[in-house]
A protein has these predicted regions:
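Canonical tetratricopeptide repeat
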Residues: 32, 66, 100, 132-135, ...
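Residue-level recognition of tetratricopeptide repeat
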Residues: 60, 94, 126-129, 160, ...
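N-terminal leader/linker segments that initiate helical-solenoid repeat arrays
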Residues: 11, 17-66
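Structural marker of alpha-solenoid helical repeat scaffolds
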Residues: 56, 90, 123-124, 156, ...
Length: 265
């Protein structure tokens, strides 16, 4: 799930640690204990303590989101949905709750549910709104919806505010849909590559794979070779080069690559 835990924890602490009543102290104690257990990777104990805090304050949106997030981590999507929906009952247009719920619904191919919650996003120019319409278009095999959503995303740099790897993987999955899809996706990838490639290996692999799928072989080769030259951890990039040379039937480069890999191993 795409959610910045560090930010969530800071916000959660600022909201939850308030007041001085005994009930508030107990709630804060259970919440902090839950955080500590989560950091130790004891998710079950963390959930138990969050639930104790929840029994004291059932209308805390941050706490409801934390419980839902933990249920996702534990693989219980049904309960996670319930808690995200409880958060939206308390605060109907909470973007964080909507973002996380819609991500969960998309993973489960729940189109009807997505159609219900997407209109609750207030900012129709936001990345969250356009992302979920794009994903709905994928699930519905609606080429027009996919194109329109990607045009809006590519025309606005809001998608760069937070790295969303699942989004870039989704882009690769629609690479061959249409010329416009390729055009808008390429614009998005170029911006993401410029911003993230120096610190994030995965965007290099995903972008290169996209370029291979659309037969931009030389461009894919360039970014893979640049990564390989500058990084020792590069076996995945060599594997993508092999895929590239195989797809374009470049026997000479494929043979040279095999020699390099034999020496490397």
């Amino acid at each position: 799930m795409a959610m910045n835990k560090k930010i969530a924890v800071v916000i959660g602490l600022s909201i939850l640690i308030s007041g001085c009543s005994s009930a508030n102290k107990e709630k804060n104690y259970n919440f902090i204990k839950g955080l500590n257990e989560y950091q130790k990777n004891d998710k079950v104990s963390a959930l138990e303590n969050y639930k104790k805090a929840y029994e004291i304050d059932k209308n805390n949106v941050v706490l409801l989101n934390e419980i839902a997030y933990l249920y996702v981590d534990l693989g219980n999507y049904e309960e996670a949905e319930n808690y995200y929906k409880k958060a939206l009952e308390v605060k109907p247009n909470d973007e964080n709750s909507l973002k996380n719920l819609l991500q969960l619904l998309y993973l489960q191919n729940k189109r009807t549910e997505m159609e219900k919650y997407i209109p609750m996003i207030v900012d129709r120019n936001s990345f969250v709104y356009n992302l979920n319409n794009f994903r709905l278009g994928i699930l519905e095999n609606d080429e027009d919806k996919v194109e329109k959503s990607l045009l809006k995303i590519s025309s606005n740099d809001k998608f760069l505010e937070e790295y969303n790897e699942n989004f870039y993987i989704d882009l690769t999955s629609v690479a061959g849909l249409s010329d416009n899809t390729i055009k808008y996706s390429n614009t998005i990838f170029e911006k993401a590559y410029r911003k993230y490639s120096s610190k994030n290996k995965n965007i290099v692999k995903i972008y290169a794979n996209f370029l291979i799928e659309i037969k931009e072989y030389r461009k894919a080769e360039d970014i893979l070779m640049k990564y390989i030259v500058n990084n020792e951890d590069n076996l995945d990039e060599y594997a993508l080069l092999k895929k590239l040379y195989t797809k374009e039937n470049n026997k000479q480069k494929l043979e040279n690559l095999k020699k390099i890999l034999r020496n490397k191993i």
